[in-house]
Regions:
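Domain-edge interaction signal
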Residues: 1-198
Length: 198
């Protein structure tokens, strides 16, 4: 089970709000955080914040991160302010990204560039149109790393024993080999073997 990195989660949220330069709705921020976690997993074969992920009726979210902004913790203590239009950086906050690596920042910036300027309604339309195929509308369930990986590649499937398999390559292509090891390296090998664009 991954360890939740609270400081990284706070700095990731701060980075996205800093890029926004204004308030972002709670739904939009939580979805952008999920997309960043997902992109980091697919690129680097490990979780960014370590938060568990859940499919909720309105969309996927990082449960540990959502708890930071739900009132169970004090967002103000971490430099965030609630407003009528969502969360923003507090005016007294000078964001620091000391806990974020260059890869972390690149992932956050990439997600912002792709989705940050979209409205909450536009993000919901993208979700309904398959932005995150591991999420199904109206379903509440845990989202595992394996489900994300399987959802992005038609070549990968899970057999009844929960082993990950790669279907045979199409005729005329080189045979792909799969080494399945637990942990991040297994996911890395699977992602490369399946030809997933990362």
């Amino acid at each position: 089970m991954p360890v939740f990195h609270r400081e990284k989660a706070i700095e990731l949220a701060a980075r996205l709000l800093w890029l926004a330069g204004t308030s972002v709705s709670a739904f939009s921020l939580l979805l952008l955080l999920y997309l960043a976690e997902r992109a980091f997993l697919l690129r680097h074969a490990e979780r960014f914040t370590g938060s568990s992920a859940e499919a909720l009726p309105d969309g996927p979210m990082l449960t540990d991160v959502a708890a930071l902004f739900s009132g169970e913790a004090s967002p103000a203590a971490d430099g965030f302010a609630r407003g009528p239009h969502g969360l923003r950086l507090a005016t007294t906050c000078k964001p620091s990204f000391d806990h974020l690596s260059a890869a972390d920042i690149e992932t956050a910036d990439s997600i912002w560039a792709q989705f940050g300027k979209l409205s909450e309604a536009e993000l919901k339309v993208l979700l309904q149109n398959g932005l995150c195929p591991e999420w199904q509308s109206g379903v509440t369930a845990t989202i595992t790393d394996t489900q994300i990986l399987v959802a992005v590649s038609s070549d990968i499937r899970i057999d009844p024993q929960n082993d990950i398999k790669i279907d045979p390559p199409p005729k005329g292509t080189k045979e792909r080999h799969l080494t399945c090891r637990p942990g991040k390296f297994g996911f890395c090998v699977i992602a490369v073997a399946a030809g997933i664009s990362l």
